[in-house]
Amino acid sequence: MASKRKRKEKQKDFAKAKLKVGKTAQKPDNYTDTSFKSKTISLPNQSIASSSNYGASSGASRSSLSTGPSLAVLTHQLSLTKHHSSNTRKEVLNYLQTHLPENPSYYKNIMTSILPLILDEDKEVRKALMSLLSAIFAKQPGLIDLHLRSTILFILSAMSHIIPNIRTTSTHFLRIIVENSHGNLINSYFVKIMRNWFVLMGWSLNEQDSKQLSMAVTTLSITAMNANSKQARIGHLQNLNKFLSKTLQHDQDKDKNKDMKLNITIHPQSYKYLLTDTVQPYQPLKLFVKEFKSEGSGSNGSGISMLDLNTISTEDLDTRKKIMNDVFKPLMIKNLNTFVKEGGEIGREANNCISIVTQACTSSSE
């Protein structure tokens, strides 16, 4: 009897238990429960970003929120400008354009977040950024003057970018700056913009390579340009026309403002004691500058060479005209004439640029 009982107990260890329907297998004796439950504590009223928006139940606070997005919403939307999806970045820019805040203090964060998108690889994102910048400058006219330095930095980087599509739209951003900024501020970047424009168009600034320049221009249109190169060059020349008109032609609005100031002055010679509009009004007199004749100067030693451009201030109109006449005009006219020979719209835009440069240099010589 004892042997049969032991034999049955041993067989139980190797026998498979038959489970009833709806019942789970019995857990072993050494089973350890590893499941756990977590609890979270949410305190939205103590959030730093939305502390001024939560709990605003008064009528005044509700009216202020209706004029634009709250700080928390705006911060979240600006964080999406770095999203990996191009559609998300474009939708954020469209949202910001339709929900521009009334509070001027918010625009510093907005400009800091959207300006790097000038170098965005997606074309639709850059188009949305153009319309957003135009809307911002129309709503806040003096904002561009505060962020002009960083904006010009990104535009110059786009003009010399390795990706052709980014270079194509770079001058369109510059056109927005030219249309919305004051001339005195954009004039200080005249030399840098002209140098990058030569790089963008594939023109050489070295006078020693002038003999090989015509061959370089003809091969450039065949090898270095893509299928949409002609349309891109037309856009570049149109924007160059506006830039040259802004920086090389006399601003008539300043004369109107001066006439208005003279109408309200007490004495006829009061204008002599008023503050000037230029940053360095006596810079052309060169009172505190010791000049040395450079090798690239003209025959009479009064010309401006490429080495002088690094130390010359371009706030003065006559200085910009002299720089154009001595440095940029000869090579620019030679390259623009190649576009004139092509005819069509690109020939008309090149002719307009030539007329502006010629007129400015003629007036400066007089």
UniProtKB/Swiss-Prot annotation:
Q: What are the recorded Gene Ontology BP terms?
A: rRNA processing
InterPro entries referenced in this protein's UniProt entry, alphabetically: ARM-like (IPR011989), ARM-type_fold (IPR016024), Ipi1_N (IPR024679)
Tell me where it resides.
Answer: Nucleus
Which GO cellular component term is one of those annotated? Answer: rixosome complex
Q: Which domain of life is it from?
A: Eukaryota
Q: Where is the composition biased (Polar residues)?
A: 27-38
Region Disordered: list its residue ranges. 1-38
A Pfam family that the UniProt record links to this protein: Ipi1_N
Q: Which UniProt keywords apply?
A: Nucleus, Ribosome biogenesis, rRNA processing
Q: Major place of localization?
A: nucleus
What is this protein for, i.e. what is its function?
Component of the RIX1 complex required for processing of ITS2 sequences from 35S pre-rRNA.
- What family, per the record? Belongs to the IPI1/TEX10 family.
Under PANTHER family, the record lists:
REGULATOR OF MICROTUBULE DYNAMICS PROTEIN, TESTIS-EXPRESSED PROTEIN 10
Complex and partners: Component of the RIX1 complex, composed of IPI1, RIX1/IPI2 and IPI3 in a 1:2:2 stoichiometry. The complex interacts (via RIX1) with MDN1 (via its hexameric AAA ATPase ring) and the pre-60S ribosome particles.
What this protein is called in its record is Pre-rRNA-processing protein IPI1-1
Protein's gene: IPI1
